[in-house]
Design a protein with these regions (language model features):
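A generic local secondary-structure boundary/capping motif
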Residues: 76-79, 149, 197
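Domain-level cores of phosphate- or acyl-group-handling catalytic modules
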Residues: 109-174
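Electropositive, glycine- and tryptophan-enriched low-complexity nucleic-acid-binding patches
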Residues: 19-23, 74-134, 213-217
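Active-site-proximal, Lys/Arg-enriched surface segment
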Residues: 25-96, 205-206, 211
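Short, conserved acidic/polar surface loops in the N-terminal third of protein domains
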Residues: 61-67, 100-103, 149-150, 171-172
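A structural signal for short, well-ordered beta-strand segments and their strand-loop junctions
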Residues: 5-8, 50-53, 101, 136-138, ...
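An anionic, glycine-rich sequence signature occurring as long contiguous blocks
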Residues: 97, 102, 110, 158-217
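Gly/serine-rich nucleotide phosphate-binding loop at the start of the catalytic core
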Residues: 1-31
Length: 217
């Protein structure tokens, strides 16, 4: 078994002890601002760049007194785990095929009352203030809210996100009632090229191109 932890570093560097490493890790704070400053050193932006909203859970199953540790859903574990939730903001340059983490937030609603969507909105506003160039946003269904998609649309951006199976949409231009995505019927042409739908709650003339994609889980 290979131990990649920072505390195990003391076993391999002469003159470095576990207590020194522990004290450093305990007091070091890699803040979102430091992440941005570090990313700026190598960040190459593109007019066709992409931003990616995502989140992960740092497993802390055996930790009981670390700030921010709570039970929360993990997509990787497909269930509740004990850990620290982290919302990440990633920049991708498709011309160079390179990624940069340019911002993050700790998801700790018990401390600050903020949702994951709140964090993403804050990071997006900050990225715009910093002059981050992008054309496309990629996000999970968690962030595919009416507010977020409308914001991106009004900014002239393209976005890709999955819609939950029970999301109500209309593909009949108002001739029939809204129905769940999973209940839609698809022609062969629509399976190849997608179909226009209106998501319930969106502005009257706001249509999305919906594609049916089979993925493995």
């Amino acid at each position: 078994q290979i131990n990649y932890t920072c505390t195990n570093l003391a076993e391999h560097i002469e003159g470095l002890d576990h207590n020194s490493v522990y004290r450093y890790l305990k007091h070091e704070r890699l803040t979102p601002r430091l992440i941005w400053e570090h990313a700026q050193e190598t960040l190459v932006m593109s007019a066709v760049g992409c931003i990616i909203f995502d989140d992960t859970v740092a497993d802390k199953d055996y930790s009981f007194e670390i700030e921010g540790v709570r039970k929360q859903y993990s997509g990787n574990a497909h269930g509740l785990v004990k850990g620290i939730g982290i919302v990440t903001f990633v920049y991708y340059n498709p011309e160079l095929d390179r990624y940069w983490v340019i911002d993050y937030r700790v998801f700790d609603p018990d401390r600050d009352g903020k949702t994951k969507l709140d964090h993403v909105n804050e990071m997006l506003s900050l990225a715009e203030k910093r002059g981050v160039q992008y054309k496309t946003a990629l996000m999970d269904s968690w962030y595919a809210t009416t507010q977020m998609m409308t914001r991106l649309h009004q900014s002239g951006k393209v976005f890709y996100c999955p819609l939950k199976a029970n999301r109500l949409v209309d593909d009949t231009e108002g001739e029939e009632s809204y129905q769940a995505v999973e209940m839609l019927s698809w022609t062969e042409t629509e399976l190849q090229q997608g179909k226009l739908v209106k998501v319930k709650g969106f502005a009257k003339n706001f249509y999305l191109k919906l594609f049916r994609v089979t993925v493995s889980t």
